[in-house]
Amino acid sequence: MKNGKNNKGKRRKPRHQRDNRERKPTFTDEDIVSKEELESGNNLISLPELRTKSISELQTTAESMNIVNLARARRQDITFSILKAHAAEDHPIFGEGVLEILQDGFGFLRSSDSSYLAGPDDVYVSPNQIRKFNLHTGDTVSGSVRPPKDNERYFALLKVAEINFEEPEN
């Protein structure tokens, strides 16, 4: 009871009004990369393209990059080694996938090759990027990717090139 009145059956007013309008993206030119800019870079390697290669083709690519001891390695390990060696020489890596946002706020770009299931070659998308670009689960995102640092397990999205096959607009 408040002020001697019975509030039974009455709806409480919300403490604050929630703004249901879509937020405008607030990203800068440093957050995006054009597809032409990516493709113009020397020695661009594409993660989706590597996923389609056979194991023998991957081993040939690895040998040409002087990566050794991959004779009995799994496909994912060979791909991971190729990408890591490629990035060590400061060459760009192109990644693409369908975004799945987890409850913690971050997300992963999943591949149709793995039926959109979690895998070691998924690309991590930070909560900050998800907010900046107003991304949602199911969006197709592509861009430049960096290899995992020492304490990380996944490749990470550096810059966004396209969202749902269109360049992001500010």
Language model features with spans:
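Short beta-strand micro-motifs enriched in acidic
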Residues: 102, 146-148
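Conserved small-residue-rich
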Residues: 131
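Charged, low-complexity terminal tails
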Residues: 1-125, 134
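P-loop NTP-binding catalytic core
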Residues: 135, 148-170
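Loop/turn positions that initiate beta-strands
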Residues: 138-140
